[in-house]
A protein has these predicted regions:
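Noncatalytic, helix-rich "gating/capping" subdomain that lines the substrate-entry/channel surface
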Residues: 1-231, 235
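Intrinsically disordered, low-complexity linker/terminal regions across diverse proteins
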Residues: 112-115, 134-138, 194, 198-201, ...
């Protein structure tokens, strides 16, 4: 099955023909998820590798292997995964769109990658015939060809075996769950597993997301909330348009293209207009959770293939459920999406004044808009196609300005590990732009609305305090190190103490002077959107 393969298969919008879907194949197959955990040699990474080996060995023993066999099997899997990892792209390399796009005919795939029996792979996965495919990362796929040729059949079976067991630990008995949790403890420092009811809710929400979303919306998301959010989004759009007009580093030609893209944003708020149809999904009470989840997984795979392979992109589809406390920008549809659940404190409070709400949800809206113009989004046009709309000079200006952010975040250290400024660049551009755009929108509001001092803070100060409150949190050092290895967002603390020193209006609001701890000279601040 698909979960046992050493690479990933999917279907998504063709980056250069965004109206249509394209079958994709790319790197995958790593139990620890990312390359760094196999190739780095710092203390924490070594601990994680040791815990992962212990985890696999224990799972092999639990399904009937004696200790010596379990040890041998674990070593075989580790050898295969280490080979895949060494050939895989790093988190930074995965951000380079051109290097991760290699479109070819299906026949070319068969010729270029003869070490994999593609006909059987796609047949077994339930795909109809298709003409074109995109290979995301050629090198790891070539490495898989070599592994398949050079590895004994027994070891290949062992690899598939651990993928099946490992993929099922969350839906088997508690002893399997406990083994999986031991690995989580080392990876993220978490000391206590979530209670079963929370895990059950997550499982159902993951499977029947929009069915739960419909109930959530009926209960918690009145039409008035949708209207309020739409007004906020329009105000932020106006503010970004003003800031584009005022940018001194862009030519008129590029500004016109940027504004055209901004005006063509598709805006999704609250919940989808058309709910997912789950009527074909069978849940059988006489079966175990494991069997039901296997059937459900098969249903969703078949459903996605039927709706997407050889079909145009469905622009009404949502990438998140209404009950998800998050938001996103999708470059291939040029859409910004704000699920119903983000419209609650600390992001949005109907009883709070505009200063707080613009610093909270306003910053988030501005953040998502800025993704349309970040290191990746800026490469896509208003129709969602990857296509350059910048003059060469403006592109250079943009890159020199974003480099300031890369260098600034590279210097930030948390839990003994440095933030990766290149990996987090897109999100840091999002925060930088989001703060500037939301602040500008608040200034527009204050031209007609009197917002006085509250609790001893000016409206401008409350705006930044609201942003800081959104990201307030407490994380164990192991979890911070984990995030800095896998997450394209900077850790929460850096999203405040790293982001604010780049924003001119913050200095004025709090009268920050040279000599203050977070002070950065004006010529070292990133002025982008």
């Amino acid at each position: 099955g698909e979960g046992t393969m050493m690479y990933g298969i999917g279907v998504g919008a063709d980056l250069r023909d965004a109206a249509n879907n394209l079958v994709e194949v790319g790197q995958s197959g790593l139990g620890l998820g990312v390359r760094d955990y196999y190739v780095n040699d710092d203390e924490q990474t070594k601990k994680i590798r040791d815990a992962y080996k212990a985890y696999m060995k224990k799972l092999f023993q639990m399904v009937g292997n004696d200790e010596a066999t379990a040890q041998k099997k674990m070593e075989a899997v580790m050898a295969i995964e280490t080979r895949i990892a060494k050939a895989s792209y790093s988190q930074v390399q995965l951000r380079d769109i051109d290097k991760n796009y290699h479109k070819m005919t299906y026949n070319q795939l068969v010729l270029d990658y003869p070490g994999i029996d593609w006909g059987n792979v796609f047949l077994a996965s339930g795909f109809p015939a298709f003409k074109e495919i995109c290979v995301g990362q050629p090198e790891p796929i070539h490495e898989v060809e070599k592994i398949l040729a050079e590895t004994s059949l027994d070891d290949l079976k062992t690899y598939a075996e651990i993928k099946v067991i490992s993929g099922a630990t969350s839906v088997l008995s508690d002893d399997f769950r406990a083994v999986s949790f031991e690995l989580s403890k080392v990876m993220s420092g978490v000391q206590q597993d979530r209670p079963r009811w929370k895990r059950a809710v997550s499982t159902v929400s993951g499977v029947l997301g929009e069915a739960i979303g419909k109930i959530y919306v009926e209960k918690y998301f009145p039409e008035s909330s949708k209207k309020r959010m739409l007004d906020l989004v329009h105000n932020l759009q106006t503010a970004l348009s003003q800031r584009i007009d005022e940018a001194t580093w862009m030519s008129a030609a590029t500004k016109a293209q940027a504004k055209d893209k901004l005006e063509n944003f598709i805006i999704k708020i609250g919940y989808p207009d058309k709910w997912k149809d789950y009527s074909g999904l069978q849940v059988d009470d006489s079966l175990s959770l494991y069997e039901n989840m296997a059937n459900i997984s098969e249903f969703f795979t078949k459903d996605a293939i039927a709706r997407k392979v050889n079909k145009p992109v469905d622009k009404t589809e949502w990438g998140m459920t209404p009950q998800t406390i998050n938001a996103y920008y999708n470059p291939t549809t040029n859409e910004i999406c704000f699920p119903a659940a983000i419209l609650q404190p600390p992001f949005f409070d109907p009883t709070a004044d505009d200063a707080m709400n613009y610093g909270g949800i306003g910053g988030v809206i501005g953040h998502e808009m800025s993704h349309g113009f970040d290191d990746q989004g800026s490469q896509f046009d208003k129709t969602g196609n990857q296509h350059n709309w910048w003059t060469a000079a403006d592109k250079k200006h943009f890159e020199s300005r974003t480099k300031i952010l890369v260098d600034h975040f590279n210097k930030i250290e948390l839990a003994g590990k440095k933030v990766n400024g290149q990996m987090t660049l897109g999100e840091n551009i999002g925060d930088n732009g989001g703060l500037n755009i939301a602040f500008r929108a608040l200034q527009n509001v204050m031209k007609t609305e009197k917002l006085g001092v509250k609790d001893g803070f000016t409206p401008e100060q409350r705006f930044f305090l609201a942003w800081a409150r959104v990201w307030a949190g407490n994380a164990r050092p192991e979890y911070l190190q984990y995030l800095m290895t896998v997450d394209v967002h900077s850790p929460n603390e850096a999203r405040v103490n790293g982001a604010l020193p780049m924003v001119d209006s913050w200095y004025k609001a709090f009268n920050i002077k040279k000599g203050d701890k977070l002070f950065v000279p004006k010529n070292k601040r990133a002025h982008i959107w």
